[in-house]
Each structure stands twice: as C-alpha cells, then as structure tokens.
Swiss-Prot record:
Function summary: Plays a role in the processing of a cluster of viral tRNAs.
Record-linked InterPro entries: T4_Cef
Gene that encodes it: cef
Protein name: Protein cef
Any single Pfam family the record assigns to this protein: T4_Cef
Native species: Enterobacteria phage T4
Length: 71
C-alpha cells in the first residue's frame, strides 16, 4: 500500500468515518508504552484488498493528533 496524500483531519471527521454505517471499514488498534494509535481503513467494497483511504488518531502524553491518508 503506497501512501499518496496526507491531510490533517479533525476528531469529528475521524468519528464520521468510524461510525458511518454506509462505509466498509477495518479498525485496528495499536498500543505501546506512551502511545495509542487507532487506524480506520476505508474500502470501496467488501472483499477489496487495498483501502482507498485511512483515518488515524494517535493519543500521546502530548495530546491527540488526527490525519487522513489517501492511497
């Protein structure tokens, strides 16, 4: 999967993607000692192998960062 475009996004945009019942999404959680990353990959249709974009939320001791990657 090659990353093409990275954009900032907001908490509202992240949650709109995460909770939209019309989207095909895969959610992944990664936790380390000082970081928690939530990755939400959006697919065009069920069964696709490559996502069309992903939205991400990283929580650290310095705060929360959101971004979107378009593939």
């Amino acid at each position: 999967m090659k990353r093409k475009i990275v954009q900032n996004c907001t908490n509202d945009e992240f949650e709109d993607v995460l909770f939209d019942p019309n989207l095909v999404v895969v959610q992944k959680e990664h936790t380390s000692k000082f970081t928690h990353l939530t990755s939400v990959y959006v697919y065009e249709k069920v069964g696709d192998k490559q996502p069309i974009y992903g939205v991400f939320r990283e929580i650290t001791e310095d705060g929360t960062t959101y971004w979107k990657e378009i593939y």
